[in-house]
């Protein structure tokens, strides 16, 4: 005698329920490790825009070193991830519901927000810390990044034969205004984002292709619609920091690259978006806040769509900037 359809459905439901409970038990045992996944890239999408680079955990000790200590601090960055000055919710407290309620969510197929993995969480913490560290004249790494930014921007408009005539800039002078700062003392512009603003500014000049960087620098320095490129970069870093503090970027980190590569790629993409709008709409300095608001809206809607601007197959930047 064949089983009744209702009994068959009940058996299938019981099996499915046991499977879900078994999976949840594994998650309970392994913790965040069971929830690891690469959410930096969409399945099947090009991944060139998010390239591997120097680990933020390697850069951090160099960026926080002070004049009184030439050697990096002995403590590792991860030792400080619970620093109360950094207002980040710890991974363990992200989901403080009872085990029963979480099992119910799984059984009912309710969407559950995945926790940040240790590497992504550490990157987020260090990014927020760097935003609080002021530029230090005595820190060799700070000066190296700043002078290299100057050279990258200056050389973008030169021919290869002119490179040899470029020398390291003096620390104070009108030449800093030509690369996008507000005054002859560039360090004063970093007050809003600390050395994170400097790091992102430098990374931007290395991340974008040479022909694109040349077009952007040319746009920023051509009167009468010129704009301070460095200041725009710092403002975009500030916008990204706001999104980071809100938790809007938490799901874009992974345990291979962490969160920092995505953060810096997003900064470069937002810079390109700013320049694309600025040129295509024939904007002036009076329109910059409107453009920043538009970039913020796009970040809130879909960070991935913004980051795809740097995809080599995307013609938008070629059509507007080149």
From Swiss-Prot:
Residues 141-303 form the ELMO domain. It comes from the Eukaryota. PROSITE patterns: ELMO. PANTHER family: ELMO DOMAIN-CONTAINING PROTEIN 3 (PTHR12771:SF2), ENGULFMENT AND CELL MOTILITY (PTHR12771). This is ELMO domain-containing protein C56G7.3.
């Amino acid at each position: 005698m064949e089983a009744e359809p209702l009994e068959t459905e009940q058996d299938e439901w019981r099996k499915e329920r046991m499977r879900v409970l078994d999976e949840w038990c594994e998650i309970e045992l392994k913790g965040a490790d069971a929830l690891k996944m690469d959410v930096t890239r969409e399945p099947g999408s090009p991944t060139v825009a998010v390239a591997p680079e120097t680990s933020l955990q390697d850069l951090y000790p160099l960026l926080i070193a002070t004049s009184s200590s030439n050697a990096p601090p002995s403590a590792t960055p991860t030792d400080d991830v619970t620093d109360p000055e950094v207002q980040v919710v710890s991974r363990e407290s992200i989901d403080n519901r009872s085990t029963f309620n979480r099992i119910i969510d799984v059984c009912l197929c309710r969407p559950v927000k995945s926790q940040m993995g240790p590497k992504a969480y550490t990157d987020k913490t260090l990014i927020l810390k760097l935003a609080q560290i002021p530029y230090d004249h005595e820190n060799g790494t700070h000066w190296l990044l700043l002078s290299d930014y100057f050279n990258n921007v200056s050389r973008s408009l030169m021919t290869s034969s002119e490179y040899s005539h470029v020398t390291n800039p003096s620390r104070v002078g009108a030449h800093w205004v030509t690369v996008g700062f507000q005054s002859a003392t560039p360090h004063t512009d970093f007050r809003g984002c600390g050395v994170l603003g400097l790091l992102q500014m430098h990374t931007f000049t290395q991340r974008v292709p040479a022909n694109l960087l040349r077009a952007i620098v040319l746009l920023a320095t051509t009167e009468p619609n010129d704009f301070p490129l460095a200041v725009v970069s710092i403002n975009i870093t500030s916008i990204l920091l706001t999104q980071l503090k809100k938790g809007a970027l938490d799901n874009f980190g992974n345990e291979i690259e962490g969160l920092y590569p995505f953060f810096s790629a997003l900064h470069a993409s937002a810079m390109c978006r700013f320049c694309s709008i600025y040129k295509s709409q024939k904007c002036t300095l009076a329109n910059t806040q409107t453009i920043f608001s538009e970039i913020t809206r796009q970040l809130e809607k879909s960070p991935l769509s913004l980051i795809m601007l740097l995809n080599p197959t995307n013609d938008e930047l070629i059509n507007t900037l080149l």
